[in-house]
Design a protein with these regions (language model features):
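Non-catalytic cell-wall polysaccharide-engagement segments
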Residues: 2-3, 7-19, 27-28, 102-203
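Conserved short loop/turn motifs at secondary-structure junctions
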Residues: 23
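Secreted/periplasmic proteins that engage bacterial cell-wall peptidoglycan
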Residues: 30-107, 123-126, 188-228
Length: 228
């Protein structure tokens, strides 16, 4: 038996991420909290951590993980929202459009909840989006972050702008690291954010944080600097 232990330890390195929920992840912002809801649901459905990160990467590219967002920051219009033939007016985390948008709104009404509710949208994503829910449950079982991100983009999101794939994969890798290292420590280490310039360092001019592309990352996160 003792001889088998090193062998078992070796093979364990190649086993995919387990599907148990991580309950000790620190989340300090609405975006992080939304990400945690999606992450936990993927694992509950038997998906992998890689699959959860891949879905988050796609969702962030679509909506910045803001459940209330409407495409192009448009305002809500009931007539337009309930028109199944109208495209380019996408709603929510996955930017559901046309018939899928109407299905989301009808589901929200049936539950007597706002369509902007994160938990409602995640439930719709996995249980109420017809064959796309079945497809998503399979896709999130992927074990490679980059490939699973691409599979979700092409097969489930069916994104028009496929040139956004590298950005989606970057987001996915960020969330994989964030969720598997305990989240936001809030101490300036790991994924945390520190508002201060380190002791002994100075800036020769103020940093202008406006107009940068990575608005979905909080200023002074390491990923903000990477993207900018």
């Amino acid at each position: 038996l003792l001889l088998l232990l090193p062998i078992l330890a070796f093979f364990s390195l190649f086993v995919g991420s387990n599907s148990s929920s991580d309950t000790d992840i620190n989340t300090n912002t609405p975006q992080q909290q939304t990400a945690k809801v999606i992450w936990d649901r993927v694992l509950k459905e038997g998906g992998t951590k890689e699959g959860a990160a891949a879905l988050l990467g796609n969702n962030q590219a679509e909506s910045e993980l803001q459940p209330s967002i409407i495409q192009s920051n448009a305002t809500y219009n009931e007539a337009k929202a309930m028109d199944t033939t109208l495209g380019g007016y996408a709603f929510g985390l996955a930017q559901w459009d046309s018939g899928r948008r109407v299905n989301l709104l009808n589901y929200a009404k049936s539950q007597k909840k706002s369509w902007t509710d994160t938990n409602l949208q995640v439930e719709f994503m996995f249980e109420q989006d017809g064959t796309d829910s079945t497809l998503l449950k399979q896709l999130v079982k992927g074990t490679n972050v980059k490939q699973t991100t691409e599979d979700i983009m092409r097969k489930w999101e069916r994104a028009g702008a496929v040139d956004s794939l590298p950005k989606r994969q970057g987001f996915a890798e960020y969330w994989y690291t964030f969720m598997t290292t305990g989240g936001d420590s809030g101490t300036g280490g790991g994924s945390g954010i520190t508002p201060d310039i380190p002791s002994g360092w100075t800036l020769d001019k103020p940093i202008n944080t406006s107009g940068y592309i990575a608005s979905s990352y909080e200023y002074k996160q390491c990923t903000w600097f990477t993207w900018n």
